[in-house]
Amino acid sequence: MNMRFSPKALVRQLGRLSLVACLSLGLLGAADWLQPQAAAAYPFWAQENYASPREATGKIVCANCHLAKKPTEVEVPHSVLPDTVFKAVVKIPYDRSSQQVLGDGSKGGLNVGAVLMLPDGFKLAPEDRISEELKEEIGNVYFTNYSADQENIILVGPLPGDDHQEIVFPVLSPDPAKDKNVFFGKYQIHVGGNRGRGQVYPTGQKSNNGVYTASAAGVIDAVTETASGYDIVIRKADGSTVTDAVPAGPSPIVAVGSEVAAGAALTNDPNVGGFGQIDTEIVLQSSNRVLGVIAFFFAVMLAQIMLVLKKKQVEKVQAAELNF
């Protein structure tokens, strides 16, 4: 992305990137030590596994791992002029009193994140184009592009959800006079917003933030608590047994002697988060067209005024003729 920074801003940006990199490496290392694949959180996995975050069907790929559906909202201007900075506000609502299951089975606050898919030509606004007022609204949020050649797709998160249920994206509109691939008109914007951990890792393995089901039909023979969760033993009709291991997090809802069908729930659903996506539209408006519309309405108003004046003039002439 072509950004223009002052020396102080550049040093500040490099320091911020270094801090983010150090924190990310530390979190990834700690998460891997605590539990395998615990660091498999979007948006990093989406970037590594998908060329685009939106499938041909229109589904944003985050929904492949975050199975629960939750609302997501977005606010953008109806129309913008070329080479103009505006804000897109993504809202990710949830009950702040909710706590999610963490990788080790304990409870903690929810994290949030979002993906903003802008039309081609639109991109994250350079720092020197963002007003101080807008910077205050954005806060200390770090944005990244989905890839080096996709400046119009912006990612953010994971972030602490309690402080970021509304995320403000600073966006710069393109100028068709400078970019011949951009045209004035109406465009679509695609938005995805997530709160909480996923239920499935990109590898297909379940996380501990979802329902665990019976691998076979039969009768519950034992429910044993272990250091890592629970072992639930099912005795099948032929007398053989199968053990379903449940990690720390979900709680068993079956008891010894209960009959279960294959695929029936053995645990509750600890997930309190979910993913939602929404589409909206924005118009890249020509300033000449705006001036043309203003001129048209001015001409219409002027014509109406002239008609009223003409009508009054005719009425005066008619009244004078009657008096004569």
From Swiss-Prot:
Its main location: membrane. GO terms for molecular function: electron transfer activity; heme binding; iron ion binding. Keywords: Electron transport, Heme, Iron, Membrane, Metal-binding, Photosynthesis, Signal, Thylakoid, Transmembrane, Transmembrane helix, Transport. It is found in: Cellular thylakoid membrane. GO terms for cellular component: plasma membrane-derived thylakoid membrane. InterPro entries: Cyt-f_TM, Cyt_f, Cyt_f_lg_dom, Cyt_f_lg_dom_sf, Rudment_hybrid_motif. Residues 1-30 form the signal peptide. Binds 1 heme group covalently. Heme binds at Y42, C62, C65, H66. Its cofactor is heme. It is a single-pass membrane protein. One of its GO terms (biological process) is photosynthesis. The chain crosses the membrane at residues 290-310. Belongs to the cytochrome f family. The 4 large subunits of the cytochrome b6-f complex are cytochrome b6, subunit IV (17 kDa polypeptide, PetD), cytochrome f and the Rieske protein, while the 4 small subunits are PetG, PetL, PetM and PetN. The complex functions as a dimer. HAMAP family: Cytb6_f_cytF. Component of the cytochrome b6-f complex, which mediates electron transfer between photosystem II (PSII) and photosystem I (PSI), cyclic electron flow around PSI, and state transitions. This is Cytochrome f.
